[in-house]
Structures are given as C-alpha cells and as structure tokens.
Design a protein with these regions (language model features):
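Surface-exposed aromatic
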Residues: 663, 740-743
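ER/secretory pathway lumenal C-terminal domains and tails of membrane proteins involved
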Residues: 1-9, 17, 22-327, 333-407, ...
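Hydrophobic face of amphipathic alpha-helices that form TPR/SEL1-like repeat modules
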Residues: 709, 743-744
Length: 799
C-alpha cells in the first residue's frame, strides 16, 4: 500500500515495451517477486525457489501444450491452471503446518505471475487482434470499453485490489495501443511494407510473427528435423542441447560480456583479467548473503531472460548471425550483481577500524574499480564497436544496385543483401528503377501482391488474388522447364544487343530449356517452393523485357539449376535466354574498376568483424574470376593488373581469404602471369605455399597437393621430396604417398632413392607385382654412381 502509482507506471511501461520487444514481458516474474517479498514473509529462500520452479513449470507446461494444438486445448489448459490455483488456494487456507501453508503461498505467487504473463501476452497482445479478426473490430472495441467500465466501477465501489488490477490492465492496453501506428502506416502502402498489416487478418499474422515459422522444443529430439550441419556435429539431442544451445548460444555470449571476446571465441585476457565476471560473482555471493529475497528476484530475472530464453527459442544450427542481443536482459541482471559487488567491496574497506587508512584506501579502491570495470572494458571494446570510417553496408548496396542494368529485377537472398539496398533506394534515392525481390519473402502472398502492385511493378502473369492467397508448394519431379524466348520485336531492336551473341534468327530463337529438380522434400515426395514457382512465373511473364539478376550471395539451391544461363557482371549474375559464358569480362571489369566503391577497405584502422570479412570475399571472388577469364583470353598483363588492384583495394592483411584453395589459386595466377620472383627472392606462389604449409593441422592430401606444385610447377624437387618423405614416414603403407614419392624421385633423377622406397613398400606388400616391375626397371636405369649409393645404403640397412 502507498506504492500503487509505481505499479501503475510499471504496467504502462510494460504495455509500451511490448512494442519494442517481447523480452520485456519476462520482467513480470521479477516484479512479482519484489511485490511478494514486500507483502509476505518467507522462512526459507531455497524452499521458495523449489516452489517457484514447481509453479512456473506447471503453468509453462500447460502453456506450451496449449500452443501446440487447437484453441480448445488452450481453454482446457487455462481451466486446468485455474483448478490447480483453486486447489492450492484451498490448501493455503486450510493447511495447519507452516511449511505446507508457505508452500501453497509460494506456488500461488508463481501461478499469479504466470497468469499475469498469460493475460498480457495471450489475452491482450494476441487476444485483442484475434478477436478483431475472428469476430470483428467492434468486438475488440467492446472488450476495451468493458475493461474501462469495470475499472470505473471498481474505483467507484472502492474495490481497491480489483481497481488496481483493472487500472494496470487499462494502462497496459493504452501502452500497447502504440502498435496502431504500424497499421496506420501500412494503410498508406509505403514501398517497404513488410507483412502488409492493414487488415485484421494480416495484423494477427504480423503480431504472431508467422513469416518466421515455429519450432517446438521437442524438435531437438527428432534428428530428422535437424539441419544437415547439426546432424553431422552432434551425437544426440542432449549433446546438441548442451554443446550448441547452452554452451555456444548462451554461455559463450555471457563470457563475451563479462570475461572477454576475440572474434567468435572467448578471450580470458581481453580485460587483462575477467574483472567484471569476478566482481559479479562476488556481488552474487554478497546479495544472497545479505538480502536473499531480492537476490532471488534478480536470479529469476537472470534465468528467465537467459536460460529460459534458450529453451523457448530452441535455436537451430547454424544461425545466420550472432544472437547475443537475445539475452540482454540476462546480462543486465548480472550487471546488477557487478554493481552490488563493487559497492560491497567499497563498503567493507570504508568500515575498516583504522580510519586513517580506510578513507584513502576507499578512494583508491573506487578509482581502481572505475579503471578495472567501465574504463578497462570500454578501452578493450571500443575499437570493435567504433563504426567510424566503415562504409561497407552503403558501398556494398551501391555496388550491387549499380551492377544491374536499367529497370532490372534483382533476386536477393537474405537481410544483408536486401535491407541495405532498400535503404539506398528509399533514403538515398539510388537506382529506384531496380526492383529488389527478396527470395525469403517471395514465399508469402502479401509480398507477391506488393511486387505486382507497387512501382516499379513486376509482371507476374495473370494470377488472381485468390490464387495468390492459396499458393503453396507444389508436388514436383525432376523435369524439363521451358521459358519463352524474347519476342522478335525485342531481338531486332537495339535494347539488348547482347542477345545477338547467340546467333539465332529472331524468328527461330529457341526457348530457354533446362531440367529443374525438386527444391523441397517430404519423405519420398519432392516439391517446388513458392519462391521457385514465382521465379519461373516472373521469368515467363517478363518475356525478357527487363534484365533479371541473382545477387552473388544467393546460394545455388535457390537458382533452380540455371547456372549455365547466367553470366557474372559484378556482384550479380544476369539470366540470359540461352547458355552463356560464366563471366561477362567487359561488364565485370567496367563495374569493378570504374563503378564500384571500396571506401576504407584498405584502411587498417577501421574495424571489420568476421561477418564483414566473409561478405568482402564476394569482391575477392569477382576479381579472381575476372583474372582467370583474362588469363584464358591470353591477356596476362591485364590479369596481373586485376590481381594487383584487388590486393590494393581489398588487402588480405585486413580481409584474409579463408579458403586455402582460392588463396593458393591467386599465387598460381601470379605465377602463370609471369611473376616468378626476383633472383634470391621467393615468388608470390612460393610465399603462399610456405604460409599454407606452416598452418596447424594441415591434412596429408593438401600436403600432397603442395608437393605436386613444388615439383610440377616450380620444379623445386628438394622441397617436394622433403614434404613427401615426411608424409611417407607418417604413412608408410599409403600407396598414394609412396607412389608419388617414387615419381618425384624419378623426375629428380634419384632412382636409387626411388628403389629404396619401393623396397620398403615390397617389404610390406611382397605380392605387389607392379611395384616389383617398377623396381626392376629403375635398377636397370641406374647409373653406376646411383647403383653404388643404393648398394651402400642396402648394406647399412641390413646391418
């Protein structure tokens, strides 16, 4: 009593916060515990924790069950929860033993907190829009009016508890009403109008985040539901849950915040020592020692916004990006303990009996804490969070859009190659003639309609709204698909002179024809996804009037096997009506050298994270592909200039190439172009080979490949022999290694050593007639000096 105003402002903030993130609802359990401890006495915190677990687990289990089935099941679960609550209420009233009475009291509090969560999440956030969708908008208005009426009645009748509850609900609804701005904005049909929530049905789909799909926690127990990457990495559901969902997707992120981070891993010495973690643990201990009740409340906040989120999200492997932001509430809770730990440390020092010592020591400790915690962490993390000079998103979007011809249609894959492009078009007004088509969204009816209706419109053929609304994957077997050729009027015009390269008579231009395999499988039945159907539909309806492109980031799985009909023209692949060369060298060179922006990519002072480094590989790939094409065309000087430009604009010191084969290919291109090193200096190829050989855990097949390059390309037989001898010592019974070592000895005119290897092999496999014949052949070809050397080695061996 006396603090009602704070509860009401909390209710209003909860309503507002729903519009920012649903994570805020989990603070309800923290608030409930704070109120509970103000009202009731608890004899044992540990019994309380057990009772809360029982109460929340029962309520949560019933909630999860209700979400998996029909609405009637939700009603059944609600009734069950009500019966349990009523039973515990009767137990609370009639129990004689203090422990039993307290148990009932604790569980009732957990039920009450869970009920508050469900009322807000299911009753208000989801219930009001569903009511408008299923019954009508008038029903929602009536429900809100009734809510206000009951509130006024409760206030007038001085039913204080009921009035407080009803006012809190009213304020939550008022805060939640800010969502209306989204629907008002959507009704204006802006160019970016995701989910199109201007009808009650679409509003419900938007609020329930239907476009993201759903995953049940039980999915981790069914390996058939796992992505291939996860199925190969984890041996069981428990292994997957602990090592990926708990350790990788929560503990690792927690360690980043309070211990230290290096790339994607944990660095225990980023902050010199993990001071935030140590002080936080100290604060946790102090909090439980001095105020168990509030410590339990903070612990509830910590767990509900941390490990409980892990259970609820049930994230699959891999994720498209790091998800540390999902657990920010948990990190906030631990930060409270850091503050408590720092305050407790200062308090203990200030209470030293020697006042002459305690005062200066308190100031010194405060200064050290200030240095060790916020300042130290700021200094350690500042560079990684400093975005000054980082133009990657802007330039990457600019370069993709500028890769497209006038009025192009561009298929993109995910967020990184879609949202920056939309920003450039809507804010910077760049290349608004290009229509960006996100393949993930292309599976949704609302997005298909927007592509058809919003300028620049896309011709999707004669498809009705009803057909779009009911569109879904279709059964599909591997079969040929035909797309109509460009019309004669287009082929004879100067709009796309590149079509003349195919050499067909405009009147006899053949259709585009290729085999399309199913892109989705359920059991033995194959399907085409909606996005695949729409790609084919757009191709056919467009009739080549507008150039069509795939962004270079689109995976082969989404290209429907059209690679032979695509030509790379920068950061995009253009689709042609007939098979073409994989690279349009002229357009590629023009875009890479004259159009694209690469601001600050060669500035070592600018921080680029791992995601950006992977993204920049698309630039490097474009340069390398162009260099290969120029080498095949016989223009070695231009090829070398292309590689030099790549090294200058996108230096490997800042953006290292992760793929060893491509890293090595650059060296081979330099060598083929005539860059073979100055006298006494290693060539680019030799430098790269040495780097690869010095990497940890190089597998033997790669070493074989490097030995082959030393021998066949560089003619460095001693180096090749050194690598192969080491491999042969490790794997003496490997025929590939022994055979290649013999071959290199032969090419190096060291037949005595070749015979020595064959002797060792025949000692292991005496029935290998091929090896025996080869040994005899080499013996017959030996020079007298080699024969003498071989005989002396044989005598030493026999001794």
């Amino acid at each position: 009593p006396g603090h009602e105003r704070y509860l009401l402002i909390i209710a209003y903030i909860v309503g507002l916060a729903i519009g920012v993130h649903l994570l805020n609802l989990l603070a309800i359990f923290f608030i409930a515990l704070i109120i509970y401890f103000k009202q009731k006495k608890v004899s044992s915190v540990w019994w309380l924790i057990l009772d809360i677990i029982i109460g929340v687990a029962v309520a949560g289990l019933l909630f999860l069950i209700s979400m998996q089935f029909r609405v009637s099941t939700f009603i059944q679960a609600t009734i069950t929860l009500g019966i349990l609550a009523l039973g515990y209420y009767q137990l609370y009233r009639k129990a004689r033993k203090p422990r039993l009475k307290e148990h009932a009291q604790n569980v009732l509090m957990a039920f009450a907190a869970s009920a508050a969560f469900l009322i807000i999440y299911v009753g208000i956030m989801k219930g009001l829009p569903i009511l408008a969708d299923k019954v009508g908008l008038w029903a929602t208005v009536l429900a809100i009016v009734l809510l206000f009426a009951v509130t006024i009645w409760a206030i007038s009748k001085k039913r204080n508890i009921l009035a407080l509850i009803m006012m809190a609900l009213v304020l939550i609804v008022v805060g939640y009403s800010t969502y209306v701005t989204i629907f008002i904005r959507s009704a204006q049909d802006p160019n970016i109008d995701e989910n199109d929530p201007e009808t009650t049905h679409q509003a419900v789909a938007y609020l329930e985040r239907e476009q993201y799909g759903q995953r049940s926690f039980t999915d981790i127990f069914n390996r058939a539901q796992w992505k291939p990457e996860a199925a190969h990495k984890y041996s069981s559901a428990l292994d997957y849950f602990w090592n990926y969902q708990i350790k990788h997707m929560y503990i690792r992120y927690f360690n980043w915040q309070f211990i230290g981070r290096k790339g994607s891993d944990v660095d225990f010495f980023q902050f010199i020592l993990p001071f935030p973690f140590i002080i936080g643990l100290f604060g946790l201990f102090v909090h439980f020692n001095e105020d168990k009740h509030k410590a339990v409340a903070v612990l509830a906040l910590f767990l509900f916004t941390g490990l409980m989120i892990v259970l609820y999200l049930n994230q699959d492997d891999p994720q498209p990006r790091e998800r540390d932001y999902s657990y920010v509430g948990s990190f906030f809770a631990f930060s409270i303990w850091i503050g408590i730990g720092a305050a407790a440390l200062l308090e203990r020092i200030s209470q030293l009996k020697n006042k002459k010592l305690s005062r200066p020591l308190t100031y010194i400790t405060a200064g050290l804490l200030l240095l060790a915690l916020p300042i130290n962490v700021l200094v350690a993390n500042y560079h990684e969070h400093d975005r000054s000079g980082n133009y990657v998103a802007s330039d990457y979007a600019y370069n993709i859009l500028q890769s497209c011809g006038p009025n192009g249609i561009l298929f993109t894959n995910g967020d990184n190659d879609t949202f920056p492009l939309w920003y450039m078009q809507e804010v910077e007004h760049l290349r608004r003639d290009v229509k960006v088509v996100n393949l993930s969204l292309l599976n949704t009816p609302w997005y298909i309609k927007q592509l058809r209706n919003i300028e620049p419109k896309i011709n999707i053929g004669n498809i009705s709204d009803a057909t779009i609304d009911n569109i879904g994957p279709i059964p599909w077997k591997k079969q040929k698909v035909r797309i109509s050729p460009p019309p004669e009027s287009l082929l004879t015009s100067d709009k796309y002179p590149e079509f003349r390269q195919f050499g067909y008579n405009p009147k006899e231009f053949p259709p585009m024809e290729w085999e399309v395999e199913p892109t989705l499988k359920y059991g033995n039945q194959g399907y085409l996804r909606v996005q695949d159907i729409m790609i084919l539909q757009i191709l056919e309806a467009n009739r080549w009037e507008r150039p069509l492109y795939f962004a270079s980031t689109v995976s082969p799985d989404n290209k429907l096997g059209m690679e032979d009909f695509m030509s790379m023209e920068g950061l995009v692949f253009r689709i042609y009506p007939q098979k073409v060369k994989r690279i349009d060298a002229d357009k590629m060179r023009h875009n890479l050298f004259n159009v694209f922006r690469y601001r600050n990519l060669n500035n070592p002072k600018v921080y680029y994270d791992d995601n950006i480094k992977r993204l920049m590989f698309n630039y490097q790939t474009a340069f390398i592909q162009l260099a290969i094409e120029e080498l095949y065309s016989g223009n070695k000087e231009r090829m070398l200039a292309t590689l030099d430009t790549m090294k200058y604009l996108i230096p490997e010191e800042i953006f290292p190439i992760e793929y060893d084969d491509i890293y090595l290919q650059i060296g081979l291109l330099y060598y083929d172009g005539g860059r073979r090193g100055e006298p006494g200096q290693p060539s680019e190829l030799e430098k790269r080979l040495e780097t690869l050989l010095n990497k940890p855990n190089v597998n033997y097949r790669n070493k074989l490949k490097y030995a082959s390059i030393y021998a066949q390309v560089l003619g460095d037989y001693p180096k090749a022999i050194q690598i192969l001898e080491e491999l042969n010592a490790q794997k003496p019974n490997d025929p590939e290694i022994s055979g290649y070592l013999v071959k290199v000895y032969e090419e190096a005119q060291q037949l005595d050593k070749a015979v020595r290897v064959l002797d060792n092999w025949l000692a292991l496999y005496p029935n290998d007639s091929g090896a025996a014949e080869m040994r005899n052949l080499y013996l017959s070809k030996m020079t007298p000096a080699q024969k003498a050397q071989y005989d002396s080695l044989t005598k030493v061996y026999h001794r």
